[in-house]
Amino acid sequence: NDRPKIIVFESVYSLDGDTSPIAGIAALARRYSALTYLGEVHAVGMYGAEGGGIAQMRGLDDGIDIIQGTLGKAFGASGGYIAASDVICDTVRSNGSGFIFTTALPPAVAAAAHVAVRHLRHDGTLRTAQQRQASRLKDCARAAGIPILEGDTHIVPVMVGDAAATMRICQLLLDDHGIYVQPINYPTVPR
């Protein structure tokens, strides 16, 4: 039918590090004349030849209607963005109440984000180092018998299985080693 349709999905899922089947979802969207809205917030700056994310890495970014990213995480600033056609961006700019009634990024934050995006776009050494460190962490966890969910992204879920123990481990890592780890417990994830 002619009803507007949109498929919203993420490229990298933050809790388990899985990646989505972007090509298949884009094909499904084309089949049903739906827009695609891809969240690349866990991937921009870290994947793709220019840090554009998983879709760029797979050569699929031109087939996505709307790509959402963040200026936090890899870029180390604050704020977010969408990359889309002029028509879609103008529509959001003119009709999106969340956009209309929000405060613009402070100039210093915008400048920092601009420099970070430009740097990561043209210099892949940090992306390579980040992937190497994630791989090293996975190898060390396996060698130590620490249960992790296997995946091919930088996200390394450690499966503790007990909420209280998870909190104690995270606090110990922070107190003794200065390492902050975000604990994720039930009900955010299954028991």
Segments predicted by a language model, with ranges:
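Structural motif of enzymes handling amino- and sulfur-group chemistry
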Residues: 104-123, 129, 133, 142-143, ...
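Active-site PLP attachment segment
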Residues: 50, 56-91
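Short, small-residue-enriched loops and turns at beta-alpha junctions
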Residues: 11-16, 43-47, 99-100, 157, ...
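Conserved PLP cofactor-binding pocket of PLP-dependent enzymes
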Residues: 176-191
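Active-site phosphate-binding strand-loop segment of PLP-dependent enzymes
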Residues: 1-38
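Conserved PLP-binding catalytic core of the aspartate aminotransferase-like
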Residues: 20, 127-137, 142-178
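A short glycine-threonine-serine/GTX helix/turn-capping micro-motif
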Residues: 96-105
